[in-house]
Amino acid sequence: MIRKYRYGTPFDTEALTEKIETTEGVFPYGEISQEEGFAFTYIMDEDDIVYGLGEANRGINKRGYCYISDCTDDPEHTEDKRSLYGAHNFIIVSGKMTFGLFFDYPSKLTFDI
């Protein structure tokens, strides 16, 4: 099931090709804070695996690193880089609870996984 939650006053980035109505109510996973911008916090179990973020460095499991989604045109893609050219703001948390998240945000995002 796909659900859409809206926070703040976003503008249409045209990232979604299908019109999805906004879901009312509380987000079912983790906590949302808007005190200092937007923050999503989810406490993972020890065995949870996180997939996604497109062309991000490191291995397939994204746990244990801080990724910055901020399109840069840096020709040196090394392990210590936190941001690469593409911004693919989609993750899947697989474990006790399994769910996916897409953050439709056209500016800098930090994923501290």
Enumerate the predicted regions with their spans.
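Catalytic and substrate-binding clefts that recognize carbohydrates or anionic sugar/phosphate headgroups
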Residues: 1-113
